[in-house]
């Protein structure tokens, strides 16, 4: 079983428009609404890959019902802890003319320390039966500064591989706690470390304690910096579609590969292929495995020794 901690669950709303023009009116061609947030999206892709998974997180208010109902429809097991306030909405406006998505992310409800204690207790009860853990998404208001450290150390105490996909100080905390994999995108990595070069910034996170750093490069694919070496993988062509769930699909592939003990080049190839398959879907957290299998042999993985990478 692969567990996912989704600290900031969302109700994801996706609007598709012909072309996004700021300051003008738009006719929405398609609307999607589903349970989301990065951790939920990762869990959805893991389930599509055939893995048992449980989502742990927080929900509150009127939107909580829509979230839990959608999880039930999708067959996703969950332990969502009730908090005061309203589960946030995350709105993506996808421009069909170029495939770019503009995101509007609410902050989410305040989560007090007592609710975090509850989540950690539930996680600890499940970790003995788990093969891996993903902690994915932003941390909600009220979260203690060391929340990521506690989650990573809890997984380590049970010898469970952990991947963390978050930003800012929490990313540095995850690295310092010795996370097996951290997965920032290029901009997040550079901003968080204050280092101007991707390879050097990844090296800095590894110096702080992260065992491996996988960097999303957008349309350029992904790069992995690991104890076994460094590789870059790229999709065969730029894809038009909805990119909002591509990073979450990649995280699912990476943790599935880690749980299976796959070599790093294979993990990276699968991550880029699954990410590309996710772009073709209208909403995040969904993949068509036929697309994934079609992309796998097209992904070029190269070992690299360069001191830097372009964004």
Residue map of PLM features:
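Glycine-rich beta-alpha junction loops
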Residues: 9-11, 59-60, 84-87, 188, ...
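Conserved N-terminal subdomain of the carbohydrate kinase-like
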Residues: 48-131, 295-311
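Conserved phosphate/ATP/ADP-binding segment of small-molecule kinases
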Residues: 145-230
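Hydrophobic anchor at the start of a short beta-strand
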Residues: 2, 52-53, 78, 162, ...
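Conserved phosphate-binding/catalytic region of the ribokinase-like
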Residues: 172, 198-311
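Glycine-rich phosphate/adenosyl-contacting loop at the front of the ribokinase-like
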Residues: 1-56, 65-66, 240, 305-311
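Structural motif
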Residues: 1-3, 102, 131-132, 212
